[in-house]
Amino acid sequence: MSWDQVWIDINIATMDPSMNEAYGAITDAALAVKDGKIAWLGKRSDLPEFDVLATPVHRGHGGWLTPGLIDAHTHLVFAGNRANEFELRLQGASYEEIARAGGGIVSTVKACRDADEAELFDLARRRLNALAKEGVTTVEIKSGYGLDLDTELKLLRVARELGQHHHVDVVTTFLGAHAVPPEFKTLGEAGTDAYVDLVVNEMLPAVVAENLADAADVFCENIAFNLEQTERVLSAAKTLGLDIKLHAEQLSNLGGSELAARLGAKSVDHIEYLDEAGVKAIAQSGTCAVLLPGAFYFLRETKLPPIDLLRQYQVPMVLASDFNPGSSPICSTLLMLNMGCTLFRLTPEEALAGVTRNAARALGRDQRVGVLREGMEADFCLWRISTPAELAYSYGVNPLVDVVKGGRLIHQ
């Protein structure tokens, strides 16, 4: 056998659902890489003969390989911060009250409109580096802090550039319909409709013309866009060839998840107020449920997502950081594993699936990454742990040892 590298003295959490063992585990295992792909994996005792002198052999010292982690929902590119709003919330103000008073998303818009691409790139690269140090190898980055054509394009260009200058794969999402900008908000519902016209008729075509986005998203909520407005944006995005997803049922239940299911969305995100009808709908459409415990924690929410219903209807559950300056300024995927278990009562295996296999599905990357099996990309992490559950159990001491991305050893 001729391979580019071989890993031995390892255990593997393949996260392959076709395997009967928890985590799709293979103990006392080995793995071989060729041309950036996994060429072989299995029990070390079954490892085919290969040229030991010509092949780099890496010893895992009894650690565990997992798929590279995936953060499937972030707002990584922004300027400024909202520490003042943090203080207001601690004094009793709600997220909605702050937003209606001109804070929230809109307060970040000015900072992003004023910042140039170099400043935004430098800020975002630091955040991406922080995720990468925790084993993240794929990340989704949304726009949504421009709310005008030029700034939305600027944010997406920065996100695309990050992916070109970093080993982490970047999936970009256009979120022009994140909030109603101040210049339209004073006109009431007519202003919101006029802004949706701008998103549909000018922003989306420009984004697609520059190939700046892989998907489009909308914040469907009573403080943002109603169902009709949401459908206009998502339908237009679909027509232009973009994947679609939706912020839905975070603060109330408007039926956004059922709309997302009808339109074939990749995911619905937040979903604290999702009901059984919505769960049934996304189960039938194959739409993923993206859970965002960082926002739940930071906003001190009490309404839990319907985890038992999602399990009952076998909806793929994704865990993501929702890293953003207002509701989840928490740049840590490993912490999301712990929060997913402690706050949402996921099992450690469900949590790990939420940042590997299911996250890949939510981003349309499940034929490439998220599971370790022959033919998939060689995209994995080596951890100094005795069981995969440790990744969710303990936080603060990073157990990451190595990262392989596309067959290339990144971190030692």
UniProtKB/Swiss-Prot annotation:
Pathway: Amino-acid degradation; L-histidine degradation into L-glutamate; N-formimidoyl-L-glutamate from L-histidine: step 3/3. N-formimidoyl-L-glutamate binds at Y145, N324, G326. It is found in: Cytoplasm. Catalyzes the hydrolytic cleavage of the carbon-nitrogen bond in imidazolone-5-propanoate to yield N-formimidoyl-L-glutamate. It is the third step in the universal histidine degradation pathway. SUPFAM superfamilies: Composite domain of metallo-dependent hydrolases (SSF51338), Metallo-dependent hydrolases (SSF51556). This is Imidazolonepropionase. It comes from the Bacteria. Pfam families: Amidohydro_1. One of its GO terms (biological process) is L-histidine catabolic process to glutamate and formamide. NCBIfam families: hutI. Binds 1 zinc or iron ion per subunit. Fe(3+) binds at H73, H75, H247, D322. GO terms for cellular component: cytoplasm. Belongs to the metallo-dependent hydrolases superfamily. HutI family. One of its GO terms (molecular function) is iron ion binding. Its cofactor is Zn(2+); Fe(3+). Zn(2+) binds at H73, H75, H247, D322. It catalyses: 4-imidazolone-5-propanoate + H2O = N-formimidoyl-L-glutamate. CDD domains: Imidazolone-5PH. Gene3D superfamilies: Metal-dependent hydrolases (3.20.20.140), Urease, subunit C, domain 1 (2.30.40.10). It comes from Shewanella amazonensis (strain ATCC BAA-1098 / SB2B). 4-imidazolone-5-propanoate binds at R82, Y145, H178, Q250, S327. Keywords: Cytoplasm, Histidine metabolism, Hydrolase, Iron, Metal-binding, Zinc.
